[in-house]
Amino acid sequence: MSEDRSKAYTDAGVDINAGNALVSRIKSIVARTHTNGVISDIGGFGGLFKPDLAGMDEPVLVSSTDGVGTKLKCAFQFGKHDTVGIDLVAMSVNDILVQGARPLFFLDYFATGKLDVDVAASVISGVAEGCRRASCALLGGETAEMPEMYAPGEYDLAGFCVGLVDNTRIVDGSSIRVGDSIIGIASTGLHSNGYSLARKVLAQSGLNGNDPLPGSDRTVAEVLLEPTAIYVDIVRSVMRDFAIKGMVHVTGGGFYDNIPRVLPATVEAHIDFGSWTVPPVFNWLLAQGNLTWPEMLQIFNCGIGYIMIVSPDVCDEVLGRVNAMHAQAWRIGSIGRRRDKAAEQVQVAF
């Protein structure tokens, strides 16, 4: 846009030229995420996607939307913006993965008070990397510059994912039975939940981003900005050869709120807390925040980012498959009969 035509809008705090510069910067990055289903280019009013429905009897679309929450405050504080886009993708694709869906495409929304092209390009590069890890296309997005809506240097993110699953292969937990095995797959850290408390604990500790995290060989900034794991490749590999009865993306609400979402009312989950390795960041939060492990499991993933529930006769094979894909997995519990409907549906043995 010519300077004369855009001057009034620029004077009002919206720099259209900066927006155009951002599109030019990210165009090739976004294009590299495109899969065979993408039939439109960046810059159109809508993204076009033609799904491959071969082999599907009753294709069902599955959608999810999410954000990154106050983990963004850590990005602002530590001046590192290239990984929160991965978090954004992970939060939505892992959610639809729970129902057995294959992610098709992703849309992002980036909002800020004053557009910093370098920062925005760094964020969108992370979104593209997340899409690459999830084998889905970054089909489109929106960049909103809104003066006076955000503090200087801050922004917010939202993401939207659409995936596909055959109706006969939807994973909904209805086939879970007493005796089934619960497999936990390692998280990379806090993922994208519990950061309001984590940041409060950090402020009280007196540590800064460059300090080593107690019990770890990494800095505070590195640990707190470690991106959320994307479990698409692992889960799809397991689904090709084994029946998964139920899955859980361990997000806000931890074990106690998320596991019951996939359990039939007649059963409960028995979790053995000592069955997996808890990363140092959670031990630090426990001690520094003066918390208990039940409180921790209500807030954080505590080292388990994703759960699969399978028949006991395939548990060892599934564990072998996951571990062979350079991820850590453990049998962390089993399904029992629910004897008291007034009690928690997740019972943890500490």
Swiss-Prot record:
The keyword Amino-acid biosynthesis does not apply. Pfam families: AIRS, AIRS_C. It catalyses: 2-formamido-N(1)-(5-O-phospho-beta-D-ribosyl)acetamidine + ATP = 5-amino-1-(5-phospho-beta-D-ribosyl)imidazole + ADP + phosphate + H(+). GO terms for cellular component: cytosol. The keyword Calcium does not apply. It is an enzyme of class 6 (ligase). One of its GO terms (biological process) is 'de novo' IMP biosynthetic process. This is Phosphoribosylformylglycinamidine cyclo-ligase. It comes from Nitratidesulfovibrio vulgaris (strain DSM 19637 / Miyazaki F) (Desulfovibrio vulgaris).
